[in-house]
Amino acid sequence: MLIERTACAGVLLTLDGKRILMDGVCREVKPYPATPPAIRTRLESSLPDALLLTHKHEDHYDEAFVSQYVQNAAGPVLGPADIPYTNQRDLTLGNIRILSLESRHIGKAQPLEHRSFVLRGSKCVWFLGDASPLLWKNRSDLPKPDVMLVPYAYAIGSGWDICRSLGASSVVLLHLPQQSDDPYGLWEAVTQTVAQHPGPALYIPKMGERILIPE
């Protein structure tokens, strides 16, 4: 399994011979970075086998890229109902079963369309977008994750407790700003929490960095 960070909170996942882009092209929403032009150009010239989109916020979603992908009929697009071209159904991609789950954005009192995804292949991968960690507390109806791809809230305070309880061997933390431009103190909060409460292997990839996890 190969995971490449391509966006603020998104990755290109290569699993069982399939390339799946998950929230993988985004715009800048300060202090969170945009997809670098070189990475975007590469993705446009070699389109993935499927797109998974969690929600419509610009730090997770780029309408022009999705439209281009659909026009080239490159593959299925899963996402919430308020994003054009998407469907909300589970599907099978090669050896991978993809579950599309209705979920709730962190801290959003007002309704917001949001999906999370569980991918079951040779490894089980959870990609949660900006879903609240509380949604997964004491859940027994979903397959145990091998790898979780999650935003910073899952490594701070009670979010880390829930993350550890789910039993993943590896956690890839996304949606962090540059350490030099962190007005909310997220890096410090993550560092303190993880130091005080050791858990699964934690990866915090830089933009464009690739993580190889043996299958």
Write out the residue ranges for each language-model feature.
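Zn-dependent metallo-beta-lactamase
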Residues: 1-21, 26-29, 35-37, 181, ...
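Active-site-proximal beta-strand elements of phosphoester/diester hydrolases
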Residues: 2-5, 20-23, 97-103, 124-130, ...
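Active-site beta-strand termini and strand-to-loop segments that position acidic
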Residues: 13-17, 93, 119-122
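Pre-active-site segment of Zn-dependent metallo-hydrolases
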Residues: 16-52, 64-68, 132-143
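Active-site neighborhood of phospho(di)ester-bond hydrolases with catalytic His/Asp-centered motifs
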Residues: 21-25, 47-63, 78-81, 126-131, ...
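Active-site HxH/HxHxD metal-binding segment of metal-dependent hydrolases
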Residues: 38-94
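Binuclear metal-ion centers of metallo-dependent hydrolases, dominated by the metallo-beta-lactamase
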Residues: 84-96, 110-111, 162-215
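Active-site-proximal loop/helix segments of hydrolase catalytic cores
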Residues: 105-166
